């Protein structure tokens, strides 16, 4: 039953990943069809992320009221209905309206399942959870690229993805009773198997032994939140504007650009699958550091003049980004205490999607005033700032741990 339950959680994250990459892949064809400028993709992305921020902040209380299973089911229904509406929307104004439930559904799934896995499973499960997000994010542009190339239609692509989402809704509905059974089993296991003394002591030191009324005052939280903000901003920046960069600055066909963006998400997916095994031997902090370095190398490759290097750069960026987000999430209970983790996870999701909300649209404004070719340079700046923020968290927590042992 435990294996079946994990499969259900992974399927839920596939449903979360599919819509995340669709807009950027379809936009080169959507834009002229709707008769709007480049910047409207950023506005739609901002609305989606705004809904995600709201539902992320509310996820803690929603889980307590209706449970993780029901919240996941309702959220998947919202995203499926919104995607179906995208396929039939007559104008960009309707897309803006439908972006609201799309964001609300995605944020609730993200925050609730991330907290559940961080609190109940090991680091490799967190990496594999986000690997399955990558499966969805990779599949989205592939599906869209097929309909754009074979049917010359982005609308059919959205409709096909909506039908996939509704099939996942059916699976979640059938297996809904399993959530309560697993929760009861987990509760019995925690009562019968208390944490080892070393683990309990580590968690006590991480949280200073009590529930913090203001999680923002915990040591290291603020630079950690900055890392989340910049990570999601950088990841969505490439996902949303990568195809437009390839088509506009590198003269690559729109359907090929959409396919290459799917391979960028494929790099994230494969990277998380592999790092799930690596976490059995290597600490999250080490993987986060090296992931940032690899992503920077991919960004440098995008600056090269030869278009044939672009695919390699995108895949390398995806591989580098792979361990960062799940690693930061899984470290939350250990760094800041399990009793603070639920509330802090909601803050982290909200801040992360704030990056998704504002950084890609701001780049859209910048691209309209300058040129889409500045994408690699902006990405490299963001990655540098994130690296500095992540290392600051490590330094603060290391100094705090050293002083606590004296």
Predicted feature locations:
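Extracytoplasmic gate region of multi-pass secondary transporters
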Residues: 23-24, 219-262, 266-270
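Helix-to-loop junctions at the C-terminal end of transmembrane segments
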Residues: 55-68, 271-283, 367-368
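A late C-terminal transmembrane helix in Major Facilitator Superfamily
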Residues: 335-372
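Cytoplasmic helix-loop-helix junction between adjacent transmembrane helices
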Residues: 98-132
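Interfacial helix-cap and linker-helix signal at transmembrane-aqueous boundaries
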Residues: 30-31, 62-63, 143-152, 246-247, ...
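Conserved MFS/SLC helix-loop-helix module at the cytosolic interface between two early adjacent transmembrane helices
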Residues: 54-93
